């Protein structure tokens, strides 16, 4: 039985405004970021990760998250998650009416120390503190696991380590776990092996996937994930993003590219690819460069030929 015979709908979880923009050395203007999110709110997306309440010293591009969350035009049926790595971040998220807090962990001790300056155990303790308090305050909590297949410092990661971490995050109260191929070196077989173990630990309905396209494997890995029953995919308009603590990591898989593939498979997302392209065009114009999305560039070229 082919994938489209078993699956008719997939949820796109847009991470461009946070994971996509967080590494920009010259951040775009706050008003431009607000407009970008407002454009995304008009595309049919149900989840738009919109900011991060983190130290401006370490992530200056997210220093305006309070203003952004205050001024975006929210729609009742859309969630606007924010990254909250500690209780201070959660306090700010609550202050600015965030609906979803995001916590993160990694099975790699080396990556954990580089990324958050703490051990895996300490990171889990922080995540537990944030998750429990967020739930008390009425927020939903999403968990991220980085380096789920390969680590830039420890090489290959055992799937069972990822599964155990996912189980810990679900136990503490996360409603969903996003499995991140941080350096983009995962392949379809590795993807299936990792998801298999995580499915056994927490159930496939609790899992999402988050791929970077460093080695051009993202769409193939998404296809493999769909075959394993995954129904939530993290994407970033135009391929925005990377990871400052993962040398060589390129952008997230482009929203446009994923939508084009899913549309061609007859899988519904509810997201308008043309409106996504307009949002992508807007933010990349502000950044002064061209989107890496192949679909965006192909559609732009097609439009120019038809003028």
Feature locations, PLM:
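Catalytic cores and adjacent flexible loops of soluble metabolic enzymes
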Residues: 4-307
